[in-house]
Amino acid sequence: MTTAAEAPRRRPSGRYAVRALGNWMNLSTPLGLLISRVGGCRVRRGPRRLWLAEGYRPAFPFARAFTVGNVLVGRGRWSPGDTRLLAHEERHSWQWLLCLGPAYLPLYTLAMAWSWLRTGDRASANVFERDAGLAAGGYPERPLRPLFGGGPVGGRRVSPPTTPRARSRSGR
């Protein structure tokens, strides 16, 4: 009987190799490594051909963690207990691949703007964050606001003026 230490290491499946190669070729992983270096991170190999960058210092972007290609960038240290957040960020690495690399940035920005318009925050209606799992990424799910006919952004209606002149024009 072989122990876990004696068992041969299993190589990650082919899909992870495809993702790693694709994100390297579309230049998103090199960009992620550059961002992590500029951000003062320590970088180490992670699971499933990912890179884990730890100790990101700049204030932007405003997130506990973010992903660029196959590089998962975190403000703190990645630990084995971060399974939900790791899975969330790993899903973003697949999104980088499907968006052909740097095209992800303007698409994500548009999705973030749409989410802010519809919910008042950047994640609740963001198709990329919803696909990666809102709760796993630490985002609350906010309700949708009306787009049209609900008054100003935020869905608040403005009451009509109540001066005597305004009432006389309305026929009341």
Residue ranges and their predicted role:
Residues T2-Y56, F60-F62, L100-R172:
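Metalloprotease/metallohydrolase-associated module, dominated by Zn2+-dependent proteases
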Residues F60-T67, V71-L86:
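Short pre-active-site segment immediately N-terminal to the catalytic Zn-binding motif
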Residues T67, E89, N126-F128:
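Hydrophobic transmembrane-helix microenvironments that flank and shape a buried ionizable site
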Residues L72, H92, L117-R118:
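Residues at structural and domain junctions
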Residues G76, W94-Q95, A136:
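Activation segment
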Residues G81, L97-L98, P102:
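Membrane-helix interface segments
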Residues R84-W96, A132:
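Active-site recognition of the HExxH zinc-binding catalytic motif
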